């Protein structure tokens, strides 16, 4: 690594930054946006997808998932994640930030069987309070792996080192 020149362990990697989230609201169409983003990623030859998005509830009462749907085969976004994995794309998905909410469980597409669902832990290896957990509706353990997610050193938009969760 050369300071200011090269940082990381994959200096020859190339990246596609694809945004599918509409920050103004939460509607089921956002699953369609996510699926379109994954389809685009596949069309340009992406090998690895990381996604911090997860859904379980939307802004309309008639479009709320139930925990019985956490089977990897019900939610559109979960089916699309499995299809991407079947095509050879390694897909990492956040377990979700619902650990302290009444939902508490992983969010979709984290329930998909063929993807890697990532949870968060503290520096003393305890589950971060916000991190979602499994089981899935069909009794699979999720998340698949965990990583430091509380009090992480990060660089902010101004280039300063600060701490954040996620």
Model features per residue range: what roles?
Residues 57-58, 97-103, 124:
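Active-site environment of divalent metal-dependent phosphoester hydrolases
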Residues 72-88:
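Catalytic-core regions built around general acid/base machinery
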Residues 42, 82-86, 146:
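Anion (oxyanion) recognition and catalysis
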Residues 3-4, 102-106, 129-132:
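Short beta-alpha junctions and helix-cap segments that line functional grooves
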Residues 16, 50, 90-92, 117, ...:
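Structural detector of well-ordered beta-strand residues that form the stable sheet scaffold
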């Amino acid at each position: 690594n050369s300071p200011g020149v090269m940082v990381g362990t994959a200096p020859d990697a190339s990246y596609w930054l694809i945004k599918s989230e509409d920050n103004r609201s939460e509607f089921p169409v956002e699953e369609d946006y996510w699926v379109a983003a994954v389809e685009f990623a596949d069309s340009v030859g992406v090998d690895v997808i990381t996604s911090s998005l997860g859904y379980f509830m939307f802004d309309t009462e008639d479009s709320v998932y139930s925990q019985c749907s956490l089977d990897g085969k019900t939610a559109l976004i979960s089916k699309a994640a499995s299809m991407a994995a079947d095509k050879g794309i390694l897909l990492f998905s956040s377990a979700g930030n619902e650990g302290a909410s009444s939902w508490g469980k992983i969010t979709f597409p984290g329930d998909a069987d063929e993807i890697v669902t990532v949870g968060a832990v503290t520096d003393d290896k305890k589950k971060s309070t916000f991190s979602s957990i499994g089981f899935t509706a069909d009794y699979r353990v999720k998340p698949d792996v965990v990583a430091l997610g509380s009090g992480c050193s990060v660089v902010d938009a101004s280039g300063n080192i600060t701490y954040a969760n996620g």
